[in-house]
A protein has these predicted regions:
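Short, glycine- and small/hydrophobic-rich beta-strand elements in well-ordered beta-sheets
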Residues: 24-52
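An amphipathic, aromatic/His-enriched active-site/gating alpha helix that lines ligand/cofactor pockets
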Residues: 31-32, 37, 56-89
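Short, charged/polar surface micro-motifs in flexible loops or helix N-caps
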Residues: 12-13, 47-48, 58-61
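Active-site-flanking beta-strand signature of metal-NTP-handling nucleotidyl enzymes
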Residues: 2-9
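Localized chelating/binding microdomains
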Residues: 10, 53, 86
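Glycine-rich beta-strand-turn "strand-cap" elements at beta-sheet edges
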Residues: 2, 40-49, 75-103
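Short, surface-exposed ligand-recognition loops at beta-strand->loop->(often short) alpha-helix junctions
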Residues: 9-19
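Hydrophobic pocket/interface hotspot
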Residues: 6, 19, 39, 53, ...
């Protein structure tokens, strides 16, 4: 499993609704991709210009192949990237002691 957290900050207030709409359109495309286990976008109540993407992929290779898909090529790159700053964090889920280590 390959887990990814992406933290997005929208640069200009008028772009917040545009980014939210684009992210909502990406979801179905991402979920239809080979190896996408789950893909969720969240918007902060406290700071509406902040979004968090939580992605779970079957493998890093599946996530890397995702870059060539329609969600990235037709929505993320042209509609979202020009309006944001982002942090990309490949991540490991912290499990409780009885579940065993993940690292």
């Amino acid at each position: 499993m390959f887990d990814l957290i992406v933290i997005i900050r929208v640069s200009e207030t008028p772009d917040i609704a545009l980014v939210a709409d684009a992210l909502s359109r990406m979801r179905a495309l991402c979920l239809a991709e080979d190896g996408c286990v789950s893909w969720e976008a969240y918007q902060s109540h406290e700071e509406p210009s902040r979004f968090v993407l939580v992605e779970h992929w079957a493998s890093r290779a599946h996530w890397e192949a995702h870059d060539a898909g329609d969600a990235i090529q037709k929505i993320y790159i042209p509609e979202i990237m020009p309006r944001i700053e982002r942090e990309v964090h490949p991540s490991v889920r912290i499990r409780s002691g009885h579940e065993g280590a993940t690292v």
